[in-house]
Amino acid sequence: MNRTVSIVIPTFNRARLLPRAIDSALAQTVPVEVVVCDHGSTDDTPQVARSYGERIRYLRRDQDRGPIVCWRDGVEQASGELIHFNYDDDWIEPQFVARTAPLLRDDVGFVYTRARIHEPGSEATRVMLRHPPGTRPMAQIVQFLLRDKLTVSPGCALFRRRDVLKNLLPEVPGARGVYGKNSGVGEDLLLFLLAALDYPRYAHVPEALSHFLAHPTSITTQAGSSGNMGVLADAYAVAKQYYLQQPGSMAPAQGLAGWWAKTRWKLASRT
């Protein structure tokens, strides 16, 4: 079954990086729709996007209302049944859609690939998400997501459009601080965890088909350089707490029970 795929590229003031993201989407070995959603860029982003003409759909909004609103706007305007988020500072291999889309069967909630991290000014890279390959029980990835301090990025994943519209929340309920307030931190994790409530399996492609650039303006890099990684982890902990409050959620495995009790106490002490 051939299903249409929309690659949504949310962007804000990254005219210099944007062409690589767009070019990688257009270079897919199967037909895709490319939607570039720009909320309030004040640099040359509009000129860069419009230079692609009818090869992409360019959505321009004058007001910046934050990443999540931009993500959702792009998905709402997309026509594909399947959605991939290709963030403006990242890029994907030409085979990304061809390798992931066939695995998104009826019982599979999402598909993700390994990702290669690139450091600016360095040829050295590292590969993350070296997980077991193939289609596997959803409980395996849920336990990883509950245990790990960070998460799997939507930038290396493929979802159903209907699931993104259902699970991409405006903000993580109960989140506090700079992260979790329409920043994409926590909301990205819930795309996976909330999808896990509706499907018994997920799929992983053991190839680094996604590329992430670690640069000074990325949220993770900014948090690390400013000593705010703890705040970042707290935002993800709030997302996990929200997931565990949902009917049908999978409780942490025995080895995680103590960790989760400490995490809940830590979050409660900050309210």
Per-region residue spans from a language model:
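Short, acidic, metal-binding catalytic loop of nucleotide-sugar glycosyltransferases
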Residues: 23-32
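A conserved acidic beta->alpha catalytic loop
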Residues: 24, 38-47, 63, 87
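Conserved donor NDP-sugar-binding/catalytic core segment of glycosyltransferases
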Residues: 95-127
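Conserved nucleotide-sugar donor-binding catalytic segment
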Residues: 134-225
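N-proximal low-complexity "stem/linker" segments adjacent to membrane-targeting elements
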Residues: 1-24
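Acidic helix N-cap motif at the loop->helix transition within catalytic regions
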Residues: 16-19, 43-51, 91, 95
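Short aromatic/hydrophobic "clamp" motif used to bind/position activated sugar donors
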Residues: 83
